[in-house]
Amino acid sequence: MNGPTGGATGGSLGEKREPVLLYDTTLRDGAQREGLVLSLQDKLRIARALDEFGMPAIEGGWPGSNPKDIEFFAAAKKIHWERAKLAAFGSTRHKSNRPESDPNLNALLDAETPIVTIFGKSWTLHVDEVIEVSRAENLAMIAESIGYIAERGRELVYDAEHFFDGYEADAAYALDTLRAARDAGASTLVLCDTNGGTLTNRMSEIVRDARAKLAADKGARNVVWGIHSHNDAELAVANALAAVDAGVRHVQATINGYGERAGNANMVSLMANLALKSEHKVAGADRLADLSTLSHEVAEIANLAPDDHQPYVGRSAFAHKGGVHGAAQVKTPRAYQHIDPALVGNRGRLVVSELGGKANTGSRAAELGVELANSGLD
């Protein structure tokens, strides 16, 4: 059964071969990377590149937070998007406002996107000490905000901020925040590892437990489950894949892993892993050979140097410096490469160095058109 954002609602916890919806948040969460500044035109260029590639959902920004994002959504209304649905992002209503008078919620409606993503508090620490409301009021803020948007015909994604930390602190309350969102009309529930510190095995346990507990609610309606992981413990991609294995079918990530602090889950690696190493269908799989181009194009627009050592798409991702490795690669490219680099638009290379052997030097000479006859290296 397909969910409202293109993913599957899920039945048993261990399903395979279901489509996984990729939701790109480069233009919003990725833009929070220190040193990364995107102009309005930069954002539009990246959005067009993502749409051309086949990204199903693109989060364009937070229209309630800054004028540039308001301008982005105004410009986006005039563009015909071939494949992507645009999403506008914002928070639940302010504690002092009713939904209908809340500027943030009304800015989301004014963006006129098919998808609206609202985040709310799952962690009692944030409820008690950050937004400083009662726990009952926080549940009301979630339900009323989502209801206000959903009743106006938008597809509603709920981002449960700090869900994993909240679950560890008070699992019952964290689950109640999800129920408030679901029952108010959210079609997708996204579990966010906002501080990026959850270990992979624990993430799997919590995702499975949350899904099972909400599915057991009497009269519960189906929702799509999502994941939003950060890389503070260098586990963002692994955690997202573990969440998919635990039943998640909506994955939020950024191109090249751009994001605040240590970054977000890397959409490039996630797409390659899911398309090449899992049984799940992912949008963009038919354009996988353009993945390196997409990665480098976004880096260029962002005025950031590509990471040569980035998995799959980096210049050195399939480079072989050691002589033993180089000799083996000449005989069979599978010897020291987990995939054919061409599948993601990359290429293998043998590197000339003091660690290299004849194969490395010979390969480089051939690339340069240098004749090695009688050199002892042929």
Question: What feature does the model see in each segment?
Answer:
Residues 61, 89, 119, 159-161, ...:
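Generic beta-strand/beta-sheet core signal
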Residues 36, 62-66, 94, 135, ...:
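Hydrophobic alpha-helical scaffolding
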Residues 82-89:
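A glycine-rich helix N-cap at a beta->alpha junction
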Residues 90-94, 121, 312-317:
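Short, glycine/charge-rich beta-strand/loop segments that flank catalytic centers
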Residues 195-198, 205-331, 335-337:
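Catalytic alpha/beta core domains of metabolic enzymes, predominantly
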Residues 27-29, 93, 123, 232, ...:
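Short, glycine-/Ser/Thr-/acidic-enriched flexible segments
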Residues 2, 6, 10-20, 24-26, ...:
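A mid-to-C-terminal "edge-of-domain" accessory segment
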Residues 20-22, 28-58, 65, 73-81, ...:
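Alpha/beta enzyme core
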